[in-house]
Amino acid sequence: MQLIIVTGLSGGGKSIAIRQLEDSGFYCIDNLPAEFLLPIAENLEKNGTRAAAVAIDARSHATFENAFTALEALSQRGIDVRILFLTASNEELLRRFSETRRRHPLSTLAEHQGRELTLNEAIAREREIMAPVTETAHVLDTTRLLPSQLRRWVQQFVKQPAAKLTLTFESFGYKRGLPYASDLVFDVRCLPNPYYSPELRPLTGLDAPVASCLLYTSDAAD
């Protein structure tokens, strides 16, 4: 089984990475408490899961040491374990939190100590907590990456082929309304209607004579 552990700084892009891994066929778990890593990985392997990814953040720092020690046990069982650590500059993290207007996860935890940390303090504290993880992880700085670029990078990281594009063509009548799930609608009422040709009326668009009637007209060529 292939197991990717996605971790890093809040605002670094973990959610984007997890969504891309899910699109690439991975069984994904977001915000997993670190102490559950070993039992869940063992359960997934037992159930025949071939590729899984879990996201763990700094809120599990109290159990980090035991959890990441368990990775050795997973490797000994033949599980291909890799850690992806996503980071960014302080300025970029501040910008991202400002855009989303979300609170830093360590800010809320700090309330139990009688004072809430500022965003700058929370980022600094998180860097301190997560520093040991970077020693064994593949570190990616996402400061200058667009979300689309990060998704492509993650796809290459796990060596998954690009998702296949699925096209569904559907004919419809305007009097019955547009198909609600359409992404693109083409008005082809300017083309000749084979229905009004007696020899073509019994046929469908899958028949070659109908296709020829439509494709080789001057309007279709334009």
Regions found by a protein language model. Give the residues of each.
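Post-Walker A helix-loop "phosphate-sensing" segment adjacent to the P-loop in P-loop NTPases
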Residues: 23-30
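Phosphate/Mg2+-binding loops and adjacent switch elements
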Residues: 85-177
